[in-house]
Design a protein with these regions (language model features):
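An N-cap/entry alpha-helix motif that binds or orients negatively charged groups
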Residues: 2-82, 187-223
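Residue-level signature of catalytic and energy-coupling elements of molecular machines
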Residues: 33, 90, 111
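Glycine- and other small-residue-rich loops at beta-strand/loop junctions that grip anionic moieties
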Residues: 42, 96, 100, 120-121, ...
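N-terminal active-site wall of soluble small-molecule enzyme domains
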Residues: 76-87, 95-108, 123-136
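Hydrophobic faces of well-ordered beta-strands that scaffold small-molecule active sites
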Residues: 88-91, 116-120, 139-143, 167
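Alpha/beta enzyme core
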Residues: 95, 109, 113, 130, ...
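Short secondary-structure boundary segments
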Residues: 122-123, 171
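Short beta->alpha connector loops
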Residues: 123-125, 145-149
Length: 223
């Protein structure tokens, strides 16, 4: 958080000194435009699932072990034949450049430094080659089952060429959810943040602002 996106009205505060995610969220909210914060932080409908997810994670705690030798403990694991230094990776999230100009290259680089997997979204705002160049670790790609099967096949082929080794297929969105925060802000992607791995002809409505509507929601319904 030492460097933040300041070109759209934000400031550059000092980042949190520890790993508390609440502090990270507060620092992000202080610098992100309100519509971007709503897109990143919000959920669908009444956000019941969002709250339930957070409550589930809040129940997880670490139980320390005392008076035992923990010098040889390792968090390493293997997933799909790839070695991970820790048993978790970076989940797919769209448009990282909304939060930072480096976007997914920074996220992939962080995963690589940690020695774990980076999963890119089909709607990443950095190219497959850029993300692949940022990490030597395992790379996966999340995809939606697009109506345009030729485009989907092309995306998968280019990701494979860039060294992405697994596909994460999203199957739980037969209906595009209503996101009240996005509707309230008329959320629209800025022109300089694009899904660069998809044909730009598919992305036009995601950049077309309409009062009281989410351009992302409208675009998703069309695809």
């Amino acid at each position: 958080m030492a460097v933040v996106w300041v070109e759209r009205g934000g400031t550059e505060p000092a980042g949190p000194d520890d790993g508390d995610l609440g502090d990270v969220a507060a620092a992000a909210r202080a610098v992100l435009p309100p519509d971007v914060w709503g897109f990143v932080q919000g959920g669908s409908g009444a956000e019941r699932t969002l709250r339930a997810n957070r409550a589930a994670y809040d129940k997880v705690a670490l139980r320390p072990r005392v008076l035992v030798d923990v010098g040889a403990i390792s968090l390493r694991t293997s997933v799909l034949g790839a070695d991970w230094a820790v048993p978790f990776g970076v989940a797919p999230m769209a448009y990282h450049r909304l939060a930072h100009p480096d976007g997914e290259t920074a996220s992939a680089g962080a995963a690589g430094e940690l020695g774990t997997m980076f999963c890119a979204s089909m709607f990443a705002s950095r190219t497959f080659a850029e993300m692949a160049g940022a990490t030597a670790g395992p790379r996966w790609l999340q995809v939606y089952y697009l109506r345009d099967r030729d485009t989907l096949a092309d995306v998968l082929a280019r990701a494979e060429q860039a060294g992405f080794g697994a596909i994460v297929l999203t199957v739980d969105t037969p209906h595009v959810a209503t996101r009240p925060r996005d509707l309230g802000s008329s959320f629209t992607l800025p022109d300089d943040v694009r899904a660069v791995n998809l044909p730009q002809a598919l992305m036009g409505t995601a950049h077309t602002a309409t009062t009281g509507r989410s351009a992302i929601q409208q675009h998703s319904r069309e695809r």
